[in-house]
Amino acid sequence: MRPPLLLFDIDGTLVNAGGAGRRALEEAMEHHLGDTVRREEAWLAGLKLDGMTDRLIVREAMMGVGHPFDEGLCGRILDTYADFLERQIRGPGYRVLPGVEPLLAELAARRSTVGLCTGNILRGARIKLARGGLDRHFGFAEGDVYGFASDGEARELIVAAALRRASARLGRKVDPREALVIGDTPRDIAAARAVGCPVLAVATGRFDVAALKAEGADFVVPTLEEQHVAALLLG
């Protein structure tokens, strides 16, 4: 039986942004905090960004250079980040990952309930998906199904927010076991597990099949173009 609700991560799962997000965020931090450290020091050096939320990345980066975290400043940095991302995303390194386009098209044709469950801020998510023409498959407005960085720094809060919005849209409480989270990192797996959702992990990010299996994903595939992925998601 196909899952009633499918929640997709973005980076490493649907698209590879070619480093656009990192470049844009470093630009934004330099713009707002350029007098804090020497420019040759990378703002995000040492941070393992895979699966981190945008807000948590900013917090960790600020603390890493000895700058006290400030909620208002974090918001301004992320607004500027989205401005810079509009330009950076046009770089040549961007690509839609294997199997994504036909899978989303088939899910749309079958009227499957899909949503986003990502550490991106809303605007950043839309920019990254729009570059590959994938934004049309997801909703970003009130009443749509999504979880973004604005819902919390911890990814499990984002999964929980997506489930709440799905419940509101469907007019009934969605049990976490009815949803399938699709992601590419151990953080995706841990967040889904914390909320009680099963997980399909795809090895199109930085983690291979063996690593994702070791993290306890319910299903692990090399790419979303695998034939049994369609069978699992489409029933």
Where are these regions (language model features)?
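Acidic, Mg2+-coordinating phosphoryl-transfer loop and its flanking beta/alpha structural elements
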Residues: 181-219
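Metal-dependent phosphoesterase signature
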Residues: 62-102, 110
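Substrate-recognition "cap/lid" segment bordering the active-site pocket of phosphatases
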Residues: 92-95, 121-180, 186-195
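Short acidic-hydrophobic, aromatic-tinged amphipathic segments that line or gate anion-handling sites
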Residues: 147, 219-224
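Conserved phosphate-coupling serine/threonine residues in phosphotransfer and NTP-handling enzymes
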Residues: 118
